[in-house]
Amino acid sequence: MIENWPKKPEGSQWTDDQWKAVVANGRDILVAAAAGSGKTAVLVERIIKKIINEENPVDVDRLLVVTFTNAAAQEMKNRIGEALEKVLIDEPGSQHVRKQLSLLNKASISTIHSFCLQVIRGYYYMLDVDPRFRIANQTENELLKEEVLDDILEEEYGIEDNTIFFELVDRYTSDRSDDDLQRMILALHTESRAHPNPEKWLDKLVEAYDVEGKTIEDLVYASYLLEDVKFQLETAEQHIRKATELAMLPDGPAPRVETLQADVALLGTLSSAARESWTSVYEAMQNVSWQTLKRIKKSDYNEDVVKQVDSLRNKAKDEVKKLQEELFSRKPESFLRDFQDMHPVLEKLVQLVKVFTERFQAMKRDKGMVDFTDLEHFCLQILSEQSENGEMNPSAVAFQYRNKFTEVLVDEYQDTNFVQESIIKFVTKDSESEGNLFMVGDVKQSIYRFRLAEPGLFLGKYKRFTQEGLGGGMKIDLAKNFRSRHEVLAGTNFIFKQIMGEEVGEIDYDADAELKLGATYPEGEDVAAELLCIQQTEEEVIDGEEGAEVEKAQLEARLMAQRIKAMVDSGYEVYDRKTDSMRPVQYRDFVILLRSMPWAPQIMEELKLQGIPVYADLATGYFEATEVNIMMNVFRVIDNPMQDIPLAAVLRSPIVGLNDEDLATLRAHGKKGSFYEVMSSFLKGAPLEEEQELHEKLEWFYNLLQGWREFARQQSLSDLIWKVYGETGYYDFVGGLPAGKQRQANLRVLYDRARQYEATSFRGLFRFLRFIERILERGDDMGTARALGEQEDVVRIMTIHKSKGLEFPVVFVAGLGRRFNTQDLMKRFLLHKDFGFGSQFIDPRKRIKYTTLSQLAIKRKMKMELIAEEMRVLYVALTRAKEKLILIGTVKDANKEMEKWLDAREHSEWLLPDHIRAGASCYLDWIAPSLYRHRDSEMLLELGQGSIPDEIYGYDTNWKVEVVDGNTLLAPEPVQEEKQELLEALREKKAVPLQSERKEEVYDRLMWKYGYEDATSYRAKQSVTEIKRNYQSEEGSDNAFIKKLRTPIKTRPRFMEKKGLTYAERGTAVHAVMQHVDLKKPITVEVLQEQIAGMVNKELLTFEQAEEIAIEKVISFFDSDLGKRVLAAKSVEREVPFTMMLAAEEAYQDWQGKSEETILVQGVIDCMIEEEDGITLIDFKTDTIEGKFPGGFEQAKPILEDRYKVQLSLYAKALEKSLQHPVKEKCLYFFDGNHVVNIEE
């Protein structure tokens, strides 16, 4: 209970709210953790505190920790493990902590799907499922769905007198295909599976259309739409009231005030009717009559004010007219007839969905596979049982889990869906006031609605729970942000206090939701947040919508390139926490965030032109890559050589090497028939002399093709790909092209994709090609293989979704003028979790169709949910910045947009009016109106404070707001004055004078000689191993260098190499084991086997490497005198990296350069131990000794000493430089024979 919570220790770094989240218990707890508030650290600390609690310690395997991703789960385990190891240092004798470390790998810290899998594996016998099931591939799943659905529809078409089915087909299919019907069935199936009881949800959907005996007031759609009617009437009234204020100005059209007041009265009557019933509004709408505006002499009044008054009145009339046309042009009973007419058709549709679900589940069961939704529903099936009234109650298994788990902790709770919520509910206590559920998340960062995440679950508890936890659950707000500067936080708060509210946005951005400063930064220059609004040029706007989009991307890319280059070149400084100091910004400090990636290729191209290194993980382009395209055509030809286009592509490719003339020659031998038939015929005849080379190329390819076709019928697809790569030499060929490594990586991915395909229930080349086509149809192009590390010094481009959880010193958020994606609202049918199904009413006999009440309601609901989701996406984007936030958007007509945005200045409340926020079509429609109410926009607007309250106008935030002329970004670089004369002479094709001021400069540059030419023959950076080799006579000779040059640079992929580990790979594996041996545990076979298995799980070793480890040799080392010294040492450091400067003449025996030259030397010391009398350096060796030297180790010892003397001397020199302490002993340990060699100077 509350009074038993531990007090926060003195000097603790935890805030009061963080500490409360760490120690609070005794009820369900919801932690609303704002961006950068340290929620993961809090979660880990809470777990640790529970594990090491002195009075009531909890075993780690009695906690269920649910994370959003596998990576998050692994990070959580690692953090807990590190924290426990720190505890163990203070309490080395604690058996409880040691036990927790051993339990950690088996602990239930995982994604919800992994937990579901664990439950299913344990209780599979309660389900009709093969215990050896596998997880289905997404594309395989899609192909199976198609197969099942085709069979069902085929059966339905074959049934006589299937009247309702054919009615359904007539309404929802075109003359060409029934694709729309198939999409409806699949969409309803998918949506239903997002609910704990799919059949119940489908039945409710049908029940909603059974309106027998009901009035329109009984329909949920009408109730919801009435709220929207009130909203739109309120908007219209605000327009009229604003017009009235303007008309009453000294130079306003005062005679029109009387008419405007009558308008307000009319709108008031309509609003009153909307508060009563649908029928009341319908009747009131039939009597709407607007008075005619009084005529005035316009010259007597301010013309602009008159125009504004007229414009506002017209906007109000348009709002009412829209309502009349959409909702109240038909009698209420006609809407009811629509539902009644559609009811049997919808009933048939739902029946088909149920049949499909049943058949699809059966097919997956037969193939021994499940998908991710199956995992959730199977788990729920095990954990629940249905009562007589259809309610789901916890099963006996659920009670077992309730007894097992002391607490259930859920990370990223805002992204939970209904099914997952039910699973969690069944393994936790029933009562919130005495519950054991701990939830962490930030509903403002819930951006996965498209994955069926339900932020309403979080919001419901946040509203229901109290900060004291009295009578129910407790909520805790973590609002302090430890990531960002004040300027970023204040700028974000200023925008969201104005745009995010409960009616529009689903969340109140109140004092509890505001971001509060928790990080400390040194004073910085130019840290103000920025809004840069680019005005497109007239030429760009005229270019059409698609052309304008291209230009927008180019304009924004150029502006960002200029800013990045300027910041890097000027030495703009950012704070480095590791060194606790400011440092010059690097390219890796920048990120460009986009809502989606279509602009990314253009932005990358523009940045590259400016010499800026850039990377974007594009999910497209893989199948467009030339090498992949050619190989896919090869496989198409193997499958069916009668396809002319793929065959011609292969013949024209480097594999065969024909040119256009060769193809024309081949076609001339047979104008009819396929290319393959012509080629076969050509090869049967005797070629002309000039066709001999063509004949040889085609014969070579034809013979290979026949072999591949035969091979494809008998062997696996992956083996076929291997064979094609090898026999054509194409893999090696692309390796020699520009970006060869990338191209080879793409071909390896194709091989891997084939192996993945073969792990599915499908087989054969034809199905594989269909498999790939299905991927492309879905728009799931994979993106080219990754050939860049995370730590590369590049500017990154990513989606806002990908950036969630990350942070960057400088953030550009671009594309803010792009319209929101509302395509889902335009579909022929709409689905919603609460409102079910909505589509147009279609009468195929009368050939009419019109909007239905359900469609209007769902569309409106989805629009408001989309607006709320986009607000949360913007919040995520703005909170990624640590030090500098730059917002960029492009508009067609800045003056016109500014006029619209300036409406916001007339409002005195913090939260902008609903109609402004709900009417936004892009992010700029929220950002600009907000900033136009701040003093920092005055340099742009020059309008003064006006009626804006001081607390808004003078809010403590710094912004730079600027409109950028697109012409300045597209203008070419200005030509230097001194070059102008030469350029003009060249344009006019005149002779350029031979004598020039630049003649000597040009001559000097052409004849310039590098002052350190001797040094160019040597590397500026060497590893210790390379220096050692230079000192060995054979390695240092010219012949050895030539041998190295002859070694192939491009390596073959793993699957094309000989099996087995190389000596180097074996050595690497042994060194890895020696690095990770736990010196605190007894060195036994069992302990080492467990450790090696753990290294395999953590991907520190491969299975093959693990099998090669000779455990007895590792034990032999620790049994030796040297090994015992390691175990007894004061301190032991392993795998110690170092870098030092070394005189070049020490590294190179044949150095010819200047004596003062130095090079950079890098190396890694295997082991160093500190004993009472000094430091000993140990280097482990896996050289083969036994059987290689006839005289045994005595013969080998001087050779080995000579081989490794330089290496260990350099290691010792590096240690002595860094530690300022002499190395007393340098030892080589050889595992082969358990030999120790001491290296003397």
Curated annotation (Swiss-Prot):
Catalytic activity, EC: 3.1.-.-, 5.6.2.4
Any one GO cellular component localisation term in the record: cytosol
Binding site for ATP: 33-40
Entry keyword set: ATP-binding, DNA damage, DNA repair, DNA-binding, Exonuclease, Helicase, Hydrolase, Isomerase, Nuclease, Nucleotide-binding
GO biological process, alphabetically ordered: double-strand break repair via homologous recombination
Cofactor: Mg(2+)
Gene3D superfamilies for this protein: 3.90.320.10, 6.10.250.2380, P-loop containing nucleotide triphosphate hydrolases
Domain of life: Bacteria
GO molecular function, one term: ATP hydrolysis activity
Reaction catalysis annotation: Couples ATP hydrolysis with the unwinding of duplex DNA by translocating in the 3'-5' direction; ATP + H2O = ADP + phosphate + H(+)
Residue ranges constituting the UvrD-like helicase ATP-binding domain according to the UniProt record: 12-485
Alphabetical list of CDD domains matching this protein: DEXQc_UvrD, SF1_C_UvrD
Residue stretches making up the UvrD-like helicase C-terminal domain: 505-805
Function: The heterodimer acts as both an ATP-dependent DNA helicase and an ATP-dependent, dual-direction single-stranded exonuclease. Recognizes the chi site generating a DNA molecule suitable for the initiation of homologous recombination. The AddA nuclease domain is required for chi fragment generation; this subunit has the helicase and 3' -> 5' nuclease activities.
Family: Belongs to the helicase family. AddA subfamily.
Complex formation: Heterodimer of AddA and AddB/RexB.
NCBIfam families: addA_Gpos (TIGR02785)
Protein name, per record: ATP-dependent helicase/nuclease subunit A
Organism: Bacillus cereus (strain G9842)
